[in-house]
């Protein structure tokens, strides 16, 4: 293993060098079934020939331009995502953590537009939203937060799948402006809420003029049988964050 990599993870003593579909091969030639889909990233498998071809063609044409200019493929993808999600606008960034960071910034902007100087976002126990400072604070796991204090202010934490706890916040907080929640918790243990949970959150957000922001980084792009997990609840959120399978590792 590379001696100059920072020890940010407890890496297993395996190095993969190639993949095909659901299979991976390590540097010793051993074959593995990737039952995790590259931690929910490789929704189309490894080394899909159509994806490899598209990457090669684009690399031969143009790799990067500034977003000061129009980017045709970006516009087409935004149109497609909005069509699938019934949403109106897309903001592209580099990772799931950045997507959730952007959602947090949107909520704060929304709060300030309502003359709330210190807007709060309701977040959940056992959640995971990323490792930037704001998303780390939103994450409901003290283990991953330890050592990075002081954390960012502006979050109110409640138990997952507990509408009464959110109602209590609504009854007692004049600064709350949004709810950030995973439709199904991933890192927290694959916790599936009650069937009426997301619909209940949507109703509470409507009643109090809050934003409902769904972290679909693990559940989005077809992983639950619908393009987005919120489709099962028959609701429409205000903000959706995507990553992982959206890029298939690219």
Give residue spans per PLM region:
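Conserved N-terminal phosphate-binding loop of PLP-dependent enzymes in the Aspartate aminotransferase
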Residues: 1-250
């Amino acid at each position: 293993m590379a001696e100059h990599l920072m020890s940010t993870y407890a890496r297993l003593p395996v190095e993969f060098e190639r993949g095909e579909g659901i299979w991976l091969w390590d540097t010793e030639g051993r074959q593995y079934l990737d039952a995790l889909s590259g931690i929910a990233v490789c929704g189309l498998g490894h080394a899909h020939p159509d994806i490899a071809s598209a990457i090669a063609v684009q690399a031969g044409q143009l790799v990067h331009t500034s977003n000061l200019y129009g980017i045709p493929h970006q516009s087409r993808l935004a149109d497609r995502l909005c069509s699938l999600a019934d949403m109106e606008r897309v903001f592209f960034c580099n990772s799931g953590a950045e997507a959730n960071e952007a959602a947090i910034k949107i909520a704060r902007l929304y709060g300030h537009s309502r003359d709330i100087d210190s807007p709060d976002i309701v977040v959940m126990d056992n959640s995971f939203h990323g490792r930037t400072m704001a998303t780390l604070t939103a994450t409901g796991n003290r283990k991953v937060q330890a050592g990075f204090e002081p954390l960012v202010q502006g979050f109110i934490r409640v138990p997952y799948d507990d509408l009464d706890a959110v109602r209590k916040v609504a009854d007692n907080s004049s600064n709350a402006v949004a709810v950030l929640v995973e439709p199904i918790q991933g890192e927290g243990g694959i916790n599936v809420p009650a069937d009426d949970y997301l619909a209940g959150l949507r109703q509470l957000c409507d009643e109090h003029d809050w934003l409902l922001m769904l972290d679909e980084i693990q559940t989005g792009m077809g992983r639950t049988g619908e393009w987005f997990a919120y489709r099962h609840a028959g609701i429409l959120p205000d903000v959706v964050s995507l990553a992982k399978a959206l890029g298939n590792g690219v």
